[in-house]
A protein has these predicted regions:
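ABC ATPase "signature
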Residues: 210-211
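Conserved ABC ATPase signature
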Residues: 126-130, 134
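Helix-to-loop junction immediately C-terminal to a conserved catalytic motif
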Residues: 35
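Conserved ABC transporter NBD signature motif
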Residues: 43-52
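A short, surface-exposed alpha-helical micro-motif characterized by mixed small hydrophobic
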Residues: 192-194
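ABC ATPase NBD coupling module
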Residues: 52-68, 94, 101, 216-220
Length: 238
């Protein structure tokens, strides 16, 4: 899906922005474009203030290392030949970060625990033996290994049950509370409002509505946004 007239920015220091829309709306394209994973044909894309189309590949790699990226498909993302713990540690090794192996392993275990994975048997297993939901949580831990300034998540809770989904969002919000900014893609407006202070609603590659999450949920202006809200499952009465 090509993007058309999309203009948005995300501040540092713990800002969180959710991109919402149905399949094919351009959400994943926008996310991948933000870190230069899709060739830029027109327009301007800046990452940490630098125009991506103007910088050499080595500098782009350095910029990307300041980001964590969680792709939509966890099945093809994790290295198949590595154990879970090694897969989480791998970004530091690739980046040349110097630290004792035991310390690196402990750091990886702490990150996995943030997303509810604490079983040593899981740490030792390979990604191919995990469920989709477990793989998503491993991907989140892996994306945080380098302590990113910006985390980009593409439907990171799509394979979770409701309880685990909430725990993951809470963990991510703790991270934004510590200063990490986040760009979060989802088809679920309610989840978006929980994850981020601001929402952008995409349809057919265009922004049809944007603003504070609370305002959009309580007073949607665009018919498409209204339809997305009406399609949400009703919350149980208490």
């Amino acid at each position: 899906m090509a993007l058309n007239g999309v203009s948005l920015s995300l501040a540092g220091g713990g800002a969180a922005l959710a991109i919402v829309g149905e399949s094919g709306s351009g959400k994943s394209t926008l996310l991948r474009s933000a870190i230069g994973l899709i060739p830029q044909k027109s327009g301007s894309v800046k990452l940490f203030g630098q125009e991506l189309k103007d910088i050499p590949a080595r500098e782009l790699t350095a910029l990307r290392r300041r980001c964590g990226y969680v792709p939509q498909d966890p099945y093809g993302a994790l290295p198949p030949g590595l154990s879970v713990i090694d897969a989480v540690m791998e970004p530091e090794i690739i980046a040349g970060v110097k630290r004792p192996k035991a310390e690196r392993r402990e750091r990886a275990k702490e990150l996995l625990a943030e997303f509810g994975l604490t079983d040593e048997r899981i740490f030792a297993s390979r990604a191919v033996g995990l469920s989709g939901g477990q793989r998503q949580r491993v991907e989140l831990a892996r994306a945080l290994m380098l302590g990113p300034e910006l985390l980009l998540c593409d439907e990171p809770t799509s394979m979770q049950d409701a309880s685990t989904r909430g725990e993951i969002i809470e963990a991510l919000r703790r991270r934004t509370g510590l200063g990490m900014s986040m760009l979060f893609v989802t088809h679920d407006l309610r989840l978006a409002a929980f994850a981020a202070e601001n929402i952008v609603v995409l349809k057919d590659g265009k922004i049809c509505e944007s603003g504070p999450s609370r305002e959009i949920m309580q007073n949607p202006q665009h018919p498409y946004t209204q339809a997305l809200i009406e399609a949400l499952p009703k919350l149980p009465e208490t």
